[in-house]
Amino acid sequence: MIEDHPVTGVGPNMVQRLYAQYRDPEAVEKVNPHLHNVPMQIAAERGLPALAIWTLFLAVAGTDLWKKLKTSRHRFLAAGGLAAIAGMLAAGLFEYNFGDSEFLMLFLVMITLPFAADRTDLP
């Protein structure tokens, strides 16, 4: 899929529909709802530019959380955000966890909470 559609991907939620055309003839599953790998799923559905942007997002989030870990009075939240990124990346090699809205919401809260907690302009 990625080789045939490197720039745009096959489109959101199209992997299941097109999987049969690309699957290995010896694959156990004839139908697959997703590719069980976050980077592969993003590249297949949305293309390599989207994968690059996703990678940049994670790199910036990780870098900023690392800075928070050293400077924030809520270091434990920054550590939790970094752990969330590490856990998502590890699990994401074997499951498309970004396709699960509950997971995605918790992940985004975990990586943004350290920044919200350090705001001083709140009443």
Question: For each predicted feature, which ranges?
Answer:
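Generic hydrophobic alpha-helical scaffold/packing signal
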Residues: 16, 40, 44, 53, ...
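Short glycine/serine/threonine-biased micro-segments
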Residues: 7-11, 45-48, 85, 90, ...
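A generic structural signal for secondary-structure junctions
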Residues: 20-24, 70, 114
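Short, flexible helix-adjacent loops and helix caps
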Residues: 7, 67-71, 95-98
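Hydrophobic transmembrane alpha-helices and their immediate junctions
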Residues: 46-86
